[in-house]
């Protein structure tokens, strides 16, 4: 199972009281439900491709409204041939939609009904239902961090975004071709959302992966930085050695001033060491890294003049 499927499976096992069951059910039916007319009677069909979500819808309807629910299974014929699970409610359909704030005065509304989110627990339950109905989250082991909740209706998607941001999740809203999404991109905010809706096992797994990824990224950055510094050091040392060999060939190292002669010989003998270490090897007394760099730069300048045929002052 995918990370998102495991998470939804966990969410469907959360025990809720009747009030919070209504809030969760309101999101599930608003986002995955459809109303039809059969034998001059309204029928609600709530559809999902997730078996555990279908069982959740079934149990919540029985818990809150105690009506008969048919559970149908159909085979999807296009693309992925997944099963489609349909919870069908024939009795009291209009009353149920009214009670869940989906139907008002005979008109369907896309906004979240305030009675469904009037306290903290109900807001969490509504967001849990919204995620079960239209949510997805990337596997943190293989992808960039991303969690989203899809809704057919822009007004409803904006409401979900606002609901998320009531918990300072920095959620964004985006219109898609066939609907809208509320989404999170920050790992920390995704963790907060998982905790918010009760996905604690998913949260632990997400945080474990996140810690390992962050550590790996930190190590990679450190290694890259160290490698770059090492390459820079080696390149500079090679240039120093090349310059010193040229000076030795053309005028001889023994003809250099004392302060340049010793550093030149040390660089030839100890090509692998840092400038700081070279400075500590000076027989005339330890000199700083900048002091060593200054003397080696003088040798490079001297070699450049030899290459161009310019006169040198010793």
Curated annotation (Swiss-Prot):
Residues of the DNA-binding region: 274-308
GO molecular function, one term: DNA binding
InterPro entries: Homing_endonucl, Sporu_reg_WhiA_N_dom, Sporulation_regulator_WhiA, Sporulation_regulator_WhiA_C, WhiA_LAGLIDADG_dom
SUPFAM superfamilies named in the record: Homing endonucleases
GO aspect biological process, one term: regulation of sporulation
Record-linked Pfam families: HTH_WhiA (PF02650), LAGLIDADG_WhiA (PF14527), WhiA_N (PF10298)
Key words, A-Z: Cell cycle, Cell division, DNA-binding
Main function: Involved in cell division and chromosome segregation.
Family: Belongs to the WhiA family.
Entry protein name: Probable cell division protein WhiA
């Amino acid at each position: 199972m995918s990370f998102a499927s495991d998470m939804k499976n966990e969410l469907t096992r959360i025990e809720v009281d009747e009030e919070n069951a209504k809030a969760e059910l309101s999101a599930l039916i608003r986002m995955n439900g459809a109303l039809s007319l059969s034998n001059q009677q309204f029928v609600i069909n709530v559809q999902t491709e997730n078996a555990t979500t279908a069982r959740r819808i079934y149990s919540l309807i029985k818990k809150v409204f105690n009506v008969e629910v048919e559970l149908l299974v159909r085979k999807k014929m296009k693309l992925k041939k997944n099963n489609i699970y349909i919870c069908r409610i024939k009795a009291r359909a209009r009353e149920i939609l009214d009670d869940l704030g989906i139907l008002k005065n005979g008109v369907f509304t896309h906004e979240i009904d305030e009675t469904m989110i009037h306290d903290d627990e109900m807001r969490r339950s509504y967001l849990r239902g919204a995620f079960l109905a239209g949510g997805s989250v990337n596997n943190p082991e293989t992808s960039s961090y991303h969690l989203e909740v899809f809704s057919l209706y822009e007004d409803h998607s904006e409401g979900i975004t606002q609901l998320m941001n009531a918990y300072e999740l920095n959620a964004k809203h985006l219109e898609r071709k066939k609907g809208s999404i509320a989404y999170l991109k920050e790992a920390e905010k995704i963790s907060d959302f998982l905790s918010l809706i009760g996905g604690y096992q998913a949260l632990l797994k997400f945080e474990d992966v996140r810690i390992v990824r962050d550590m790996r990224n930190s190590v990679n950055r450190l290694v890259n930085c160290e490698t770059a510094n090492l390459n820079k050091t080696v390149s500079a040392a090679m240039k120093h050695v090349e310059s010193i060999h040229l000076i030795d060939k053309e005028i001889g190292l023994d003809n250099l001033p004392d302060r340049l002669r010793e550093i030149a010989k040390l660089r030839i003998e100890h090509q692998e060491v840092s400038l700081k270490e070279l400075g500590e090897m000076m027989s005339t007394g330890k000199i700083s890294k900048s002091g060593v760099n200054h003397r080696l730069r003088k040798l490079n300048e001297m070699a450049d003049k030899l290459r161009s045929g310019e006169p040198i002052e010793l």
